[in-house]
């Protein structure tokens, strides 16, 4: 799966979480500024995660404010 991500802080955050998922095989979670939409990086793999992020970026490409990883 290839995800086209626009440049900017949001892109860095998304690329970071996707890279984390690929290298550490962990789950991740992010939330939008309005905190009404929460999404997760599936443990199942990077393809699933990329697909999900693609959907969310279409909804609000500049609204991603933070990415957290479970301890």
Swiss-Prot record:
Localization (cell): Plastid, Chloroplast
Q: Example GO biological process term?
A: glycolytic process
Anything else known: On the 2D-gel the determined pI of this protein is: 5.6, its MW is: 25.2 kDa.
This protein's GO cellular component annotations are: chloroplast
Molecular function terms from GO = fructose-bisphosphate aldolase activity
- Provide the family line: Belongs to the class I fructose-bisphosphate aldolase family.
Q: What is its EC number?
A: 4.1.2.13
Protein known as: Putative fructose-bisphosphate aldolase, chloroplastic
Give the enzyme class.
Answer: lyase
User: Catalysed reaction(s)?
Assistant: beta-D-fructose 1,6-bisphosphate = D-glyceraldehyde 3-phosphate + dihydroxyacetone phosphate
The alphabetical list of record keywords is:
Chloroplast, Glycolysis, Lyase, Plastid, Schiff base
